[in-house]
Amino acid sequence: DAEAIIKKAKGDNDLLVAYLHWGSEYRAKPDESSVAMAEWLIDQGIDVVIGGHPHWSQGASTYKGKPILWSLGNFIFDQDWSEETRYGLAASFELVENEVRAIELYPIRIDVSQPRLLEGEAKRLRLEELAKRSDADLADGVRSGRILVK
């Protein structure tokens, strides 16, 4: 079962990341089942939860001090019929003693199935939108493109 697999993986590894294909499509916030699953995974020992599938970038949260990126959105995709589906997010994680201390956010825009990093005002506006979708205590970090994890 999943609980036993996570427990074994936790014993064999310094950091566990769960990357899930989950959630309801075309929504700015995670659905209740995604929230419940993320919390359950962290309760079992997962250190970082990252989601995908909704085709929209969703915000960031923490649960018991562990980071959750609800959905990175699209990266290389051809859903150009919707403005929101033409955005995605890449992230990097700064580790200190096997714990996530910071997350760098790299918003992208997809043009003809090609991801391109946003810069300047476009980047600022996208991070502002993601901040609105994030937990209030993380909003300033999301706006800056660097979330500090406590």
Q: How should these model regions be labeled?
A:
Residues 1-150:
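Acidic, metal/ion-coordinating pockets
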